[in-house]
């Protein structure tokens, strides 16, 4: 490095050399370094190429979006029960923006055309399955078909069932606004007494009684939109005897749903059956894909809004995503069936079920199959002696308490606020109201009464028993008996005088011991004695006149 002499210091010279701004002062022909214009040229070319690239990408994205909207096909559907897949094309702008208006389920057994709408295929299935059923099951199946023909299920877009008033009520009351419908009055005895199929307690606790044959109940409102990723509920099996003759199911259904049919056996319903079967619109044989339920288990159902996915949990563990692309309003449904009246769940039907591995192993080993007496054979519900169903109690949790499924607790998948925006009534006995002058309360009850004798300013005044108002009169009497007259003596004397006067009056006017006839005779006798007798007076007068005449004659 060269150090420049002169006024410029060595440090400044080094800086000039480093930054390239120093020119030798001794050079007679200083040469200015050429100016490089390539930087601006490179920057302009880079910007042009970047703009072209973005334009091409935008054109590609627009073309892809147009293809997906108008020419694309949805992904293949998957049948969770049969394992078969089928593809269906649903076009429209709703699919592109994630709305499920076109398809209800990717599961082909839920609502895809050609499944239950194909009358020929349905007729063939009926010819194959109905002979395996009992008379009671066939009757339920036919009633269910007729019910849904007369009352078609409401298959509309999610969130369109409620009106403005219902939304406001749910917003105000929260989970407190939900409850299960009561039992229909269709089960009576020969005397006309109502025999309820189930009882609803505390709005969300359902108990299926011994009188139940086949029934179900729905929640009064569909699944809500809680502004989270999903909505979720759980059902705890609080009471369910071992080897019970009651079959129950928990699931989601559309409205209206046959009140005499358990969820999963009619159109547009999905349910987890207590036998472990997963039923999706399936009144016939279903596959056992889930664990058998027993007392103490907790079953959960969830619905993810974005993909329309329905998933199931068992004791806090996620089992499977059952269906996809569900875009309709679904209701929580509970149902129970008396298996004694069915062939499907009695001995013959259980032996024919390929999923009953334990029974088949027992038969292959030559062991006798042990079943409860209630499901050994098919009973007729029209018999005079009905078969009592085992009671089953189910408790539904919509988020009023913690979930067993951890994800639902962390992400708050409940139905909403427990108490709503209105909340609970204020506590009028709290410490915060003691500072409010408007709602200040009075003295503590009971009040302090004055019990001192002679205290007229007390609550009841100066009152003495058996004396009454004579006390004041006694105080005004003149002093006697040596100037000593007590209040008690005056009151006693006044009371005695009153008794005497009243007794005399009663004897004179209210004597009921006298005979009325004697009274009349007595009055007449008294009147005769007091009234003068005219006849006797005349006789006396004549007698006196005769004596006077005789005296006068003698004198003459």
UniProtKB/Swiss-Prot annotation:
Write out the entry's keywords from A to Z.
Endosome, Glycoprotein, Membrane, Protein transport, Signal-anchor, Transmembrane, Transmembrane helix, Transport, Vacuole
Q: Where is this region: Disordered?
A: 500-556
For biological process, the GO terms are: protein transport to vacuole involved in ubiquitin-dependent protein catabolic process via the multivesicular body sorting pathway
SUPFAM superfamilies linked to this entry: Concanavalin A-like lectins/glucanases (SSF49899)
Ranges of Low complexity composition bias in the record: 528-542
Stretches in topological domain Cytoplasmic: 1-59
Q: Short name of one Pfam family for this protein?
A: SPRY
Name recorded for this polypeptide: Protein SSH4
Tell me the organism's taxonomic lineage: Eukaryota, Fungi, Dikarya, Ascomycota, Saccharomycotina
């Amino acid at each position: 490095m060269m150090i420049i002499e002169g006024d410029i210091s060595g440090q400044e010279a080094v800086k000039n050399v480093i930054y390239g701004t120093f020119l030798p002062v001794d050079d007679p022909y200083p040469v200015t370094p050429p100016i490089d214009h390539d930087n601006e040229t490179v920057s302009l070319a880079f910007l042009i190429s970047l703009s072209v690239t973005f334009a091409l990408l935008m054109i590609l994205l627009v073309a892809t979006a147009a293809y997906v909207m108008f020419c694309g096909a949805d992904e293949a559907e998957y049948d969770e029960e049969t394992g078969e897949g089928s593809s269906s094309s649903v076009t429209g702008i709703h699919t592109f923006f994630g709305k499920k208006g076109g398809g209800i389920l990717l599961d082909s057994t839920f609502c895809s055309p050609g499944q239950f709408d194909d009358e020929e295929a349905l007729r063939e299935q009926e010819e194959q399955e109905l002979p395996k059923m009992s008379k009671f099951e066939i009757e339920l199946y036919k009633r269910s078909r007729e019910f849904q023909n007369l009352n078609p299920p409401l298959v509309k877009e999610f969130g369109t069932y409620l009106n403005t008033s219902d939304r406001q009520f749910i917003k105000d009351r929260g989970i407190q606004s939900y409850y299960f419908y009561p039992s229909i009055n269709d089960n009576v005895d020969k005397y006309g007494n109502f025999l309820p199929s189930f009882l609803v307690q505390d709005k969300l606790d359902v108990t299926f009684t011994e009188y139940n044959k086949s029934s179900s109940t729905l929640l009064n409102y569909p699944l809500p939109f809680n502004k989270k990723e999903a909505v979720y509920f759980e059902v705890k099996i609080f009471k369910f005897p071992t080897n019970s003759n009651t079959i129950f199911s928990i699931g989601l259904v559309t409205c209206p749903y046959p009140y005499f049919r358990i969820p999963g056996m009619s159109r547009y319903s999905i349910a987890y059956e207590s036998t472990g079967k997963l039923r999706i619109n399936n009144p016939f044989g279903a596959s056992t894909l889930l664990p058998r339920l027993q007392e103490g288990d907790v079953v959960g159902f969830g619905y993810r809004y974005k993909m329309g996915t329905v998933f199931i949990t068992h004791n806090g563990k996620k089992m499977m995503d059952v269906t996809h692309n569900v875009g309709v309003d679904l209701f929580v449904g509970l149902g129970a069936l008396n298996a004694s009246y069915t062939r499907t769940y009695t001995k013959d039907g259980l032996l024919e079920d390929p999923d009953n591995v334990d029974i088949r192993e027992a038969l292959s080993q030559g062991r006798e199959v042990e079943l409860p007496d209630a499901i050994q054979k098919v009973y007729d519900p029209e018999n005079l002696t009905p078969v009592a169903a085992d009671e089953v109690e189910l408790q539904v949790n919509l988020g009023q308490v913690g979930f067993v499924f951890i994800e639902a607790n962390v992400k708050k998948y409940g139905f909403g606020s427990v108490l709503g925006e209105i909340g609970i009534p204020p506590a009028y006995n709290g410490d915060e109201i003691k500072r409010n002058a408007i709602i200040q309360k009075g003295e503590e009850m009971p009040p302090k009464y004055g019990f001192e004798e002679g205290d007229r300013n007390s609550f009841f005044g100066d009152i003495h028993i058996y004396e009454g108002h004579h006390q004041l009169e006694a105080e005004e009497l003149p002093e006697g008996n040596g100037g000593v007259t007590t209040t008690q003596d005056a009151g006693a004397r006044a009371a005695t005088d009153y008794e005497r006067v009243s007794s005399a009056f009663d004897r004179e006017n209210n004597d009921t011991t006298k005979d009325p006839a004697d009274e009349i005779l007595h009055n007449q006798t008294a009147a005769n004695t007091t009234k003068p007798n005219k006849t006797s007076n005349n006789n006396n007068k004549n007698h006196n006149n005769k004596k006077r005449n005789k005296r006068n004659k003698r004198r003459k």
